């Protein structure tokens, strides 16, 4: 039996690009609290994403998925959500989308996956405050982040 070839995926590429913007605090889910109940991401917030659509190019291997992005922040020990901290993460992502000369870059994916070349990144709407969180987390949602990319062939 042969080992399957690992291919770059929209989630992996978007996570890798977002890490160039907000650092190593991006994943598809929020990290679980530690054994002592502490949140490892409380100081700087956290970014989660989920695939929301997009259409691969019909003729060339160019991908342009749309990702739903949520920016999270928390004040441990307080019932007051830190809206400013979550908003700053969303604003950092928006600012990175406007920095057109810095966007084209090759991003490294997890071991075994080929690299991907990000060609463009842009949002499809303004971020908005999500106020229905009973846990007192602050959350801003970006309705669509499009990261245009192609897999780098060795």
Over which residues does each language-model region extend?
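Small/polar-rich, solvent-exposed N-terminal microdomains that initiate assembly or binding
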Residues: 1-59, 100-116
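Short, solvent-exposed beta-alpha or beta-beta edge segments that form flexible loop/patches at the rim
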Residues: 25-82, 123-137, 152
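A structural signal for short, well-ordered beta-strand segments
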Residues: 67-69, 142-148
